[in-house]
Amino acid sequence: MEDDGKSPPDSAYGEPKKYDPNFKGPIQNRGCTDILCCILIVLGIIAYVAVGIVAWTYGDPRKVIYPTDSKGQFCGQVGTPNEKKPFLFYFNIMKCASPLVLLQFQCPTTQICVENCPDRFLTYLSVATTQQNFDYYKQFCRDGFNNFTKSPVEVLRDRDCPAMITPSKPFTRRCFPAINTQKGVVMVGNSTTFDDGRGDKQRNVTDLLEGAKKANVVLEARQVAMKIFEDYTVSWYWIIIGLIIAMVISLIFVVLLRFLAGIMVWVMIVLVIAVMGYGIFHCYMEYARLKGQSGSDVTLKDIGFQTDIRVYLHLRQTWLAFMIILCILEVIVILLLIFLRKRIMIAIALIKEASRAVGFVMSSLVFPLFTFLLVCLCIAYWAITAVFLSTSNEAVYKVFNETQCDFSGNTCNPETFNTTNVTRVCPDATCQFAFYGGETYYHKYLIVFQIYNAFMFLWLANFVIALGQVTLAGAFASYYWAFKKPDDMPAFPIFSSLGRALRYHTGSLAFGSLILAIVQMIRILLEYLDHKLKGADNKCARFLLCCLKCCFWCLEKFIKFLNRNAYIMIAIYGTNFCTSARNAFFLLMRNIIRVAVLDKVTDFLLFLGKLLVVGCVGILAFFFFSRRIQIVQDTAPTLNYYWVPILTVILGSYLIAHGFFSVYGMCVDTLFLCFLEDLERNDGSTERPYFMSGSLQKLLNKSNQTKPDK
């Protein structure tokens, strides 16, 4: 089978590589490249460390973890006066129903830290008059309140104590009324009404309910989050077991590819078709089973969004949609296999060659762990710095008032507030902790530091990935260009390639990752603008933004593709980034047919391998967590949403499979570029023999001439 695969000659894409008798693979004698970018990334890292030090100096993560009282003090923080008071108590939670809550995210009522939430109905008037339960009531008064000679009216006026307390339960470290329903009637404790402690008529419990809802605007979202968190706490070890199974399957698959590449690829293709076929069969059986059942004919549009995915599984339309999607995917895969069957044979040969290369460079299978750990380090540094930056603001106090007040919302000082004229003009006004901010030079530029933190994270993460790619490329290129394998290969190909990359090409890797980081940062800013403009009526702006997002998405994909091939050229020839990118692009364009078909076919086959691993583990997780495996039915944990661990296992399995198959992907890409250069440099003669394996030569109808016997 002859496979020319070249595009017509075009000088615009340069001349084919000429034969060089001295070329034996990755060049050893090379110099430093893109030194300016190397200096830039070093300076960037120094500045990044400086930003981190400043953030860690001024930041305080306690502001995220612990609630704060009206004085800005933390509740439950070890080493503070409130160490034994972990819960936040609202003097009058009904005031949280004020629209100010939605504008300023703070209730216009006094808030203190308490040891326990109240468990009974009491009013200050009743305890002050009878002295019963007074010691219990005092724990809900301001710290230091001991002037028992003050009249109840003065105590309530000065907000020394709450007018009433109600049975409450802690939620997210805050005391909320213990509201429940009995036979559809809203109650708190065992009552539907309560005394507000101000001598007014009995108030309805629904007033408390309204205040509690506004006190926590995201109460329902937090409840869902808490349920998801609970699911993780009872299923985390099963999730880990599922991920271990995915790792074992991926490892077995990669090892089998090493020895049985051709058979494994065809087995993989058949299994993918079989798995999707079973999915279609299962969806049809569920669709047929639900026929005639009450409520199963409700449409997805009518039922709307539900957090419990089990609701959707009782609808026939859900299983019909799944079946249609799987049928479309099945047809697409089968058609691709039919039309690409000839190219698949060449792709299998390339995968076989990649398997041999991995066999000679076995350390390449564990090298992605090094890259993974470095990426995790980048993520950890970015996340910690972001938290410290976001919590490095100072406590800001604002004027809060129940009624209309000209000073409402102004900044105030709680130490001197009672001596100002604000209390004379607005007697009900209070100076309370509002949020964390600041007016200093540092606080004004916090957003700049956050943007720099995000940008440096993208730059360093892309740099680490680039380092991994160029290291693997150098190792696999040394395999391909070794005429006598493994005699002509270095003793430690991975370490040799890593050393060359760090010593000579840090600047080139920084250059490529910088370009990619800039494009990714622009995409993030466009997403932010899109989020801000969602409520806008300007359709022209929305359309323009959508076009920009699409263009930069395509640009990012192209740059990733170009960078990947440029790193291969850097690993082989030691040229700078721009030269390597140009040479790689021209080489690919001179062989555009092979690139468009052969290289993408191998990517498709490797993707099927990932799909097979994810499909096997995903189906197993679905049957286990939905309690459909009789043998281990009692072992499966009881969950609020069983899709939570299933989706986690599926996502984790894909990342694990991607980690293992990425080695093969980089190996295939490297061998592919070497393969193209081999065809351009050599012709199979005794003077210019091919470096490709005998199986590839046979498949392409190429051969090396042997020297005639004398």
Curated annotation (Swiss-Prot):
Family (UniProt): Belongs to the CTL (choline transporter-like) family.
Topology, Cytoplasmic side: 1-34, 258-260, 341-368, 482-508, 589-603, 664-710
Gene Ontology biological-process entries: choline transport; ethanolamine transport; transmembrane transport
Positions bearing carbohydrate: N147, N190, N204, N401, N418, N421
Source species of the chain: Xenopus laevis (African clawed frog)
Role noted for this protein: Choline/H+ antiporter, mainly in mitochodria. Also acts as a low-affinity ethanolamine/H+ antiporter, regulating the supply of extracellular ethanolamine (Etn) for the CDP-Etn pathway, redistribute intracellular Etn and balance the CDP-Cho and CDP-Etn arms of the Kennedy pathway.
Gene Ontology terms, MF aspect: antiporter activity; choline transmembrane transporter activity; ethanolamine transmembrane transporter activity; transmembrane transporter activity
Pfam families, per the entry: Choline_transpo
Residue ranges annotated as Extracellular topological domain: 56-236, 282-319, 390-458, 530-567, 625-642
This protein's UniProt keywords: Antiport, Cell membrane, Glycoprotein, Membrane, Mitochondrion, Mitochondrion outer membrane, Phosphoprotein, Transmembrane, Transmembrane helix, Transport
Location(s) in or outside the cell: Cell membrane; Mitochondrion outer membrane
Segments forming a coiled coil: none
Membrane disposition: Multi-pass membrane protein
Top-rank lineage group of the source organism: Eukaryota
Main location: membrane
GO CC annotations, alphabetized: membrane; mitochondrial outer membrane; plasma membrane
Record field: transmembrane: 35-55, 237-257, 261-281, 320-340, 369-389, 459-481, 509-529, 568-588, 604-624, 643-663
UniProt name for this protein: Choline transporter-like protein 2
Catalytic reactions on record: choline(out) + n H(+)(in) = choline(in) + n H(+)(out); ethanolamine(out) + n H(+)(in) = ethanolamine(in) + n H(+)(out)
